[in-house]
Design a protein with these regions (language model features):
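Residues forming the flavin
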Residues: 1-122, 126-207, 211-369
Length: 369
């Protein structure tokens, strides 16, 4: 039987004892069946251009989410992306992570932070943002769907891909970039020599450019753990500024406890229908925000450090979210003024460690981990 409607948004309201599932549906006003092969909801597929002979290129430093989506956007607009990524492609990266999980050693350039897809590849793929600087969030969902994501990405209020499915989606993004004339250089950390060649619009000798191309600019898409790159940028007079961030710990609980608290003694049938419960906590302590972050129902805690002799963790869930444990970051906001001495303009860590003011936050992180 053909469908008369399709779900375009789904959310769960667990604030009251009686659980409510809210659906927004798309239907023909005359009740006619909808096309079977139509995406849910309808969206314009991307139009990627063949750029093998493009005259203009842009260099992208980092193949995390920002770098990959920047590359795809450039291809849609007729500009050839050239990506430099310090880590490995996703299949090789998985091997290094498996070695780390067996306590057999950390590869400082290929781990839960560095490599194709960035930290997000092995960090769950929750597609939700509290930021008011949201941009075109729906287009992000559509592109993930285009590269193999589930239909639920297009209508779930808190969409989730899963760390088991993300590597395949990321690989397909890379294949698309290469197919349309882009370049990706793995195991290539942008050091001072390469950075200077890029900003001076000269081609490094070890790239594989097949023809002359004019470099229009450089997009920095590096992650928070690339401390060495930030220091290199500062040494090359790139303007940097201290910004606020959040730090904390990760708490783990039995998933059954969270289900009971959020769903009010749910039946196994209900859990099967709506999935394991998640939560969000926000409060103020002495005028400072404290909140849960990256809550992972049915998830795992993983070693997410990228440097030796440090302790950093993250959380992730597979697509089915069926681990017996839930976990969430519990973090507090760190403000730029927290790094100052006597509320003046001299960062505290500048005084103690001879650190430049713009990099004081990085030094603070290093002291804690």
């Amino acid at each position: 039987m053909e469908q008369k409607f399709r779900v375009v948004k789904r959310s769960i309201d667990a604030r009251q004892k009686q659980l409510k599932v809210h659906l927004t549906v798309l239907t023909d006003e005359h009740g006619a069946p909808l096309p079977k092969d139509a995406p849910i909801p309808l969206y314009e597929p991307p139009h990627f251009q063949d750029l093998h002979n493009a005259e203009h290129s842009v260099a992208i430093i980092g193949a995390g989410p920002a770098g990959l989506f920047a590359a795809l956007t450039l291809i849609e607009h007729g500009i050839r992306p050239i990506i430099y990524e310090r880590g490995k492609e996703v299949a090789e990266r998985k091997k290094d992570i498996a070695t780390l999980n067996r306590n057999q050693g950390l590869n400082a350039e290929s781990n839960y932070c560095f490599g194709e897809g960035g930290a997000g590849t092995f960090s769950d793929g929750k597609l939700f943002s509290r930021s008011k600087k949201r941009g075109n969030m729906q287009r992000v969902m559509e592109l993930f769907h285009h590269f193999g994501g589930d239909d639920r990405l297009l209508y779930e209020a808190h969409a989730h891909i899963g760390s088991d499915k993300l590597p395949t989606i990321i690989r397909r993004m890379r294949e698309c970039i290469l197919e349309h004339g882009g370049e990706i250089h793995f195991s290539t950390c942008v050091d001072e020599q390469l950075f200077r060649s890029l900003i001076n619009n000269t081609t490094p000798s070890y790239t594989t450019l097949h023809h002359s191309t004019r470099l229009l600019g450089v997009i920095l898409s590096i992650g928070h753990s690339a401390h060495d790159t930030y220091h290199m940028l500062h040494a090359n007079s790139v303007a940097l500024a201290t910004k606020g961030f959040a730090m904390g710990v990760r708490a783990e609980h039995p998933q059954a406890l969270i289900n009971k608290l959020m769903y009010h003694d749910p039946s196994p049938e209900l859990i099967h229908l709506v999935g394991n419960a998640s939560y969000s906590l926000v409060t103020q302590v002495q005028g400072r925000g404290v909140y849960s972050f990256c809550m992972c129902p049915g998830g795992h805690i993983v070693p997410a450090g990228s440097a030796l002799n440090s302790c950093v963790v993250n959380g992730m869930s597979a697509s089915h979210r069926n681990s017996p444990y839930a976990n969430s970051g519990m973090v507090v906001e760190i403000r730029p003024e927290d790094l100052l001495v006597n509320n003046n303009t001299t960062p505290h860590y500048t005084t103690l460690h001879h650190t430049t003011p713009a990099l004081a936050g990085l030094r603070f992180q290093q002291e804690l981990v």
